[in-house]
Design a protein with these regions (language model features):
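NAD-dependent ADP-ribosyltransferases
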Residues: 1-220
């Protein structure tokens, strides 16, 4: 994958133009009520291995937690998914109690993996932290993903609506998220995974083949 060197002031327009040139018709998916958010820098790993438990992350040496830390994590009173579960969210529930918080998986700063309704065993609801949280007892494999949703255009709009936010750190994050998106597309292509990648704020899907060939951004 090649690089393109850009001045910091040109990054926003370049990312917008690249997304616009790579857009295709929006892929509507059904049967994908479960959401799982992850950072852009971790999304390629999720595509390769699935949504891993803390136990599996350490087993694969993707994390290096101490035995003491693992013991704390296994206390499901403090971390509801413990060592052997993963957290999922469901939106639009109408049975939350007034004192329950609701996790919103729609975010400009995270990648949202949409997981199949029919995943087995069925995730169990756990309202300890959020009223709409569900715990799946194991690893969610990539074949259970129905879509991968991003909202880079929303992040850009937030920057443009508040010019004071368009500092070097924000542009650096945009650059990193864009480059991580390219990595995600390459992993999908190399693994021959037919999972739609959707820019849900812009209302379109991404031509994975086309955009995966785009150069990575390097700021001058």
């Amino acid at each position: 994958m090649s690089d393109i060197k850009l001045d910091r002031c040109d990054v926003v327009d370049y990312v917008k133009n690249t997304l616009d040139n790579s857009k295709t018709n929006f892929d509507h998916v059904t049967g994908a009520k479960y959401h799982h958010n992850t950072k852009y820098c971790d999304a390629s790993s999720v595509i390769r291995f699935g949504i891993l438990t803390m136990s599996e992350l350490n087993k694969l040496k993707l994390r290096h937690d101490s035995p003491e830390s693992l013991k704390v994590m296994n206390d499901t009173l403090s971390q509801v998914n413990g060592l052997n579960g993963v957290s999922l969210a469901v939106t639009g529930l109408d049975d939350l109690y007034p004192d329950e918080d609701e996790f919103d998986p729609i975010s400009a700063s995270f990648v949202d993996f949409r997981v199949s309704d029919t995943i087995s065993p069925r995730p169990g609801r756990n309202s300890t932290k959020y009223g709409n949280e569900f715990i799946y007892p194991g690893v969610v494999r990539p074949e259970e993903f129905r879509a991968i949703d991003i909202r880079i255009l929303e992040y850009i709009e937030q920057l443009e609506n508040n010019v004071s936010n368009m500092g070097s750190r924000s542009i650096e994050e945009l650059k990193n998220n864009y480059n991580n998106l390219l990595d995600m597309l390459k992993v999908l292509k190399d693994a021959n995974l037919d999972i739609p990648v959707r820019e849900t704020f812009g209302g379109f899907s991404i031509d994975k083949e086309k955009m995966s060939e785009c150069p990575r951004i390097v700021i001058k």
